[in-house]
């Protein structure tokens, strides 16, 4: 086999100058379609938000090129001084934001953060106690299909049938019966505030550690609009997007130095290799934004808007799980209307409103169908919608749901077209990413 000697440097024309529109028109076209979707659809998915241009710029920065295994000042690669600077900024801002002693900003996601806590503080086969999916919990809290449900003896608690609030009598009974190593508070579709003090008392009673997953409401805590779990939990996990308005990623917080050391070892080298420095840079930017006074206004408005949306839907005849919301999300039980979550979220998307089908407490339908939808206010609040706009959105959603009730699973094309027009007009009044 002959090897030809190359006497010229290898460099692709345009490699450092051409943008994606030139290099890959197919991807560029998809990016354009996604931008238009975000600009002209109303986003009600409670776990989604709209980041600032500054966060986008940081995430698309040259930090994507850098490997930085380890932690600030203790890296396994050279050339990490700028990475140290930006990660330390993220850590310090997170500690200030949540008034805590230790922060690990390296988890790639909320699921990775939860997995790292379990790796650090439990062993495979240990008992964990978390909220069941149908009560509003999350996959990573011990659901059977997830790693947490396969590698651990996962026991699940639920909510009361009469008011859909956490059944603390059940939590206490299960904790005393099973003696879990870890109790998990938090969820992905629970609209009320959690009694962190009660969870901690139960954990202390059985010698368990308490983990609070505040992925959904972290931004509300940061903005002072929601109680903080930091004084009660041994460890707190969160995502950095959702109500926190940062890039998609995870984070772990604690006030316990010994736990912090175990968490750091569990994240790296236990669960992950190199951190995503471009994402950590974007986290630092988002945390800096959340430290500004106006973020407190955002957090308060997010809750007020969610309540306005839930109240309008309730006035239009919808059944609101737990009677309303204290947070950024509401869960709508569609069984009184005789329609499914799948039919509802598909009809709403045809109407230029995105939400997600979601199980409701004691749901008889499978997760691919569900008896409910979950709606949220974070993205709409970010683009400037207020109470009046969310009340109007409530009417739009109710019009589509009423059409499904009256016309069947395919809905009413005329109603959906009318709502699309109203959505477009509203979005044009509150533009995003212009120029």
From Swiss-Prot:
Question: What biological process terms from GO does the record include?
Answer: glycine biosynthetic process from serine; tetrahydrofolate interconversion
Catalysed reaction(s) here are: (6R)-5,10-methylene-5,6,7,8-tetrahydrofolate + glycine + H2O = (6S)-5,6,7,8-tetrahydrofolate + L-serine
Keywords assigned by UniProt, alphabetized: Amino-acid biosynthesis, Cytoplasm, One-carbon metabolism, Pyridoxal phosphate, Transferase
Record-listed (6S)-5,6,7,8-tetrahydrofolate binding positions: 133, 137-139
**How is this protein annotated for GO cellular component?**
cytosol
Q: Which residues are annotated as site, described as Plays an important role in substrate specificity? A: 241
Q: Which pathway is this protein assigned to? A: One-carbon metabolism; tetrahydrofolate interconversion; Amino-acid biosynthesis; glycine biosynthesis; glycine from L-serine: step 1/1
Any idea of its EC number? Answer: 2.1.2.1
Tell me the superkingdom of the source.
Bacteria
Q: Which GO terms describe its molecular function?
A: glycine hydroxymethyltransferase activity; pyridoxal phosphate binding
Provide the assembly information. Answer: Homodimer.
Q: Write down what this protein is called.
A: Serine hydroxymethyltransferase
User: Which species is listed as the source?
Assistant: Sphingopyxis alaskensis (strain DSM 13593 / LMG 18877 / RB2256) (Sphingomonas alaskensis)
Where is the organism placed in the taxonomic lineage, from the top? Bacteria, Pseudomonadati, Pseudomonadota, Alphaproteobacteria, Sphingomonadales
Recorded name of the encoding gene: glyA
């Amino acid at each position: 086999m002959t090897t030809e000697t190359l006497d010229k440097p290898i460099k692709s024309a345009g490699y450092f100058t051409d943008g994606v529109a030139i290099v890959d028109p197919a991807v560029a076209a998809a990016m354009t379609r996604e931008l238009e979707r975000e600009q002209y659809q109303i986003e009600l998915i409670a776990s989604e938000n709209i980041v600032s241009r500054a966060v986008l710029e940081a995430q698309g920065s040259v930090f994507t090129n850098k490997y930085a295994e380890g932690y600030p000042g203790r890296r396994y690669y050279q050339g990490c001084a700028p990475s140290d600077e930006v990660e330390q900024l993220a850590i310090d801002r997170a500690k200030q934001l949540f008034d805590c002693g230790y922060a690990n900003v390296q988890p790639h996601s909320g699921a990775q953060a939860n997995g790292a806590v379990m790796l650090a503080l439990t062993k495979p086969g240990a008992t964990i106690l978390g909220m069941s999916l149908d009560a509003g919990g999350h996959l990573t809290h011990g659901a059977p299909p997830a790693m947490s449900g396969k590698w651990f003896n996962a026991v699940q608690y639920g909510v009361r049938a009469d008011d859909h609030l956490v059944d603390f009598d059940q939590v206490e009974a299960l904790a005393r019966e099973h003696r879990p190593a870890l109790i998990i508070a938090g969820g992905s579709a629970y609209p009320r505030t959690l009694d962190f003090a009660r969870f901690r008392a139960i954990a202390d009673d059985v010698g368990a550690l308490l983990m609070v997953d505040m992925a959904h409401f972290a931004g509300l805590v940061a903005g002072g609009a929601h109680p903080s779990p930091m004084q009660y939990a041994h460890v707190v996990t969160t995502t950095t997007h959702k109500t926190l308005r940062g890039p998609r990623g995870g984070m772990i917080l604690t006030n316990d130095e010994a736990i912090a050391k175990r968490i750091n070892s569990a994240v790296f080298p236990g669960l992950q290799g190199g951190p995503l420095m471009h994402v950590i840079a974007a986290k630092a930017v988002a945390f800096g934004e959340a430290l500004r006074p106006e973020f407190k206004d955002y957090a308060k408005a997010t809750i007020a808007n969610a309540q306005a949306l839930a109240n309008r839907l309730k006035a239009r005849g919808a059944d609101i799980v737990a009677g309303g919301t204290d947070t950024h999300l509401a869960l709508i039980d569609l069984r009184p209307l005789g329609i499914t979550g799948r039919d509802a979220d598909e009809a709403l998307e045809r109407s230029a409103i995105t939400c997600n089908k979601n199980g409701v407490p004691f749901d008889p339908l499978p997760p691919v169908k569900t008896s409910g939808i979950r709606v949220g206010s974070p993205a709409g609040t970010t683009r400037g919608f207020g109470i009046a706009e969310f009340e109007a959105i409530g009417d739009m959603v109710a019009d589509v749901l009423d059409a499904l009730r009256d016309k069947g699973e395919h809905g009413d094309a005329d109603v959906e077209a009318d709502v699309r027009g109203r959505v477009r007009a509203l979005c044009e009044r509150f533009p995003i990413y212009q120029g």
